[in-house]
């Protein structure tokens, strides 16, 4: 039971980040590698703020807005400086490595085990029934993930959200509506990286420490979650894409845990497993698309 809870907990955390990747990959068709930097940015800022006595609750929205700023930088480099999308993300991701170290006080690892977090505080320790306490982490994570999902669903149904979708499908349509397609892309990248930073902040609070390598492979996990979720659950017409992405993140985490449990590979091979599963998902996804096109 504890293992299953752990899978759900990590799946929900990465689902928040995957919602951001959904914006860049599925909506904007933008290969944004800066999430590998904004994810640890949120973790570093959260750890730094909590160590300085800031409320762990306030640390999360501040982490989100830090990610928004980083996403804006990626967008400005791409739109205003005319740098290719892939390179824009790489530049910001690389720069954020140093930024994250500075935020963490030039420490590659910043623990805050003795500080309160959203998961471990006076309220969770003393005000909850004993029967609920083992599940408090997954409950809080589910609430945060669902809030992010519903906010994103709401935004995508606003005028700005429709323009964001149009910018990915047909940017000429955005121009015909007298809107700046570059500005729309910047907004999309800002929101996406905001989600990534928020997820990093949540993970840092769950682990009660920040590590500089926490963002390695974040983009791969996000892509796998988006592709797995949207491809596997696309047959359910009434299921929203954001719901499919969250389910995909949890399912992907289960796949990784299953492979490790088989003892064929070691836990230290986690990144290798992650990459291999993503490759398998991409191959199967491409095969399904070809079959669909052939039958059509």
Model-found features: residue ranges?
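Single transmembrane alpha-helix segments in multi-pass membrane proteins
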Residues: 3-55, 60, 77-81, 227-238, ...
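Loop-to-transmembrane alpha-helix initiation sites
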Residues: 10, 86-87, 108, 137-138, ...
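Alpha-helical transmembrane segments within multi-pass membrane transporters and channels
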Residues: 21, 54-94, 145-146, 248-252
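Alpha-helical transmembrane segments in inner-membrane proteins
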Residues: 66, 76, 91-118, 123-125, ...
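Helix-loop-helix "hairpin" substructures at the membrane interface of multi-pass membrane proteins
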Residues: 70, 131-214
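Transmembrane helix-bundle core of multi-pass membrane transporters
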Residues: 85, 91-92, 96-157, 187, ...
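Cytosolic-side transmembrane-helix boundaries in multi-pass membrane proteins
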Residues: 169-183, 236, 243, 255-296
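Transmembrane alpha-helical segments in multi-pass inner-membrane proteins
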Residues: 196-272
């Amino acid at each position: 039971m504890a293992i299953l809870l752990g899978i759900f907990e990590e799946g929900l955390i990465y689902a928040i980040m995957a919602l951001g990747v959904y914006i860049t990959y599925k909506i904007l068709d933008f290969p944004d590698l800066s999430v590998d930097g904004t994810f640890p940015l949120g973790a570093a800022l959260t750890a730094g703020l909590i160590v300085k006595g800031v409320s762990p609750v306030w640390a999360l929205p501040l982490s989100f807005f830090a990610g928004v700023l980083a996403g804006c930088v990626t967008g400005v480099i791409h739109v205003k400086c005319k740098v290719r999308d892939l390179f824009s993300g790489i530049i910001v991701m690389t720069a954020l490595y140093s930024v994250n170290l500075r935020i963490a006080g030039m420490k590659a690892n910043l623990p805050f085990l003795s500080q309160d977090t959203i998961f471990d505080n006076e309220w969770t320790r003393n005000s909850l029934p004993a029967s609920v306490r083992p599940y408090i982490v997954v409950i809080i994570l589910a609430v945060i993930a669902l809030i992010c999902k519903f906010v994103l669903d709401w935004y995508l149904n606003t005028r700005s959200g429709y323009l964001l979708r149009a910018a990915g499908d047909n940017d000429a349509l955005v121009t015909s509506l007298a809107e700046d397609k570059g500005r729309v892309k910047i907004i999309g990248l800002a929101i996406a990286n905001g989600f990534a930073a928020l997820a990093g902040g949540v993970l840092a609070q769950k682990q009660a420490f920040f590590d500089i390598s926490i963002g390695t492979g974040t983009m791969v996990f996000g892509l796998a979650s988006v592709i797995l979720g949207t491809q596997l659950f696309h047959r359910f017409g009434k299921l929203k894409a954001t719901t499919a992405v969250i389910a995909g993140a949890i399912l992907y985490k289960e796949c990784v845990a299953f492979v490790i449990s088989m003892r064929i590979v070691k836990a230290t091979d986690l990144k290798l497993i992650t990459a291999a599963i993503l490759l398998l998902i991409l191959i199967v996804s491409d095969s399904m698309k070809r079959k669909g096109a052939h039958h059509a």
